[in-house]
């Protein structure tokens, strides 16, 4: 390998390190949900398995319709799972409509300091308790 090729490899390594250092930190590598954790690179939601980049549903946010590279990344229905800590400090305000059809369930402790209020009404016009009717496959 000549010196010019070695220089290009070193520059490429610096560029890759610069790009990935913006997304991850030292804590992300060793944390519970980090690179080596349950949702890391080798986990069911990692790069090569399940819903990862190489999976049938991977790259879903980059295209218009269908599955894979043609998947739509805007509106959908299904389960949303959040694991880990979600620290929120300060005031969070949501203006506009937040349509939720289905059930919202919290599992575990939800610690909040101060006052938490949720006000609104269901105006989806579906006429069913969970929005999709009693024949829906997933009622939680």
From Swiss-Prot:
The lineage of its organism: Eukaryota, Metazoa, Ecdysozoa, Arthropoda, Hexapoda. Belongs to the chorion protein family. It comes from the Eukaryota. This is Chorion class A protein Ld2/Ld41. One of its GO terms (molecular function) is structural constituent of egg chorion. It holds the Pfam family Chorion_1. The keyword Signal applies. This protein is one of many from the eggshell of the gypsy moth. Keywords: Repeat, Signal. Residues 1-21 form the signal peptide. One of its GO terms (cellular component) is egg chorion. One of its GO terms (biological process) is chorion-containing eggshell formation.
């Amino acid at each position: 390998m000549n010196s010019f090729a070695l220089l290009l490899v070193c520059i490429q390594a610096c560029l890759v390190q610069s790009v990935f250092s913006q997304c991850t930190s030292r804590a992300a590598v060793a944390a519970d949900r980090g690179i080596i954790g349950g949702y890391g690179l080798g986990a069911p939601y990692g790069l090569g398995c399940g819903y990862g980049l190489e999976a049938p549903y991977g790259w879903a946010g980059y295209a218009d319709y269908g599955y894979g590279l043609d998947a739509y990344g805007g509106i959908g229905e299904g389960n949303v799972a959040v694991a880990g800590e979600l620290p929120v400090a300060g005031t969070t305000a949501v203006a506009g409509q937040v349509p939720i059809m289905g059930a919202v369930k919290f599992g575990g402790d939800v610690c909040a300091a101060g006052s938490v209020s949720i006000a609104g009404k269901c105006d989806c016009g579906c006429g069913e308790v969970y929005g999709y009717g009693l024949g829906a496959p997933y009622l939680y």
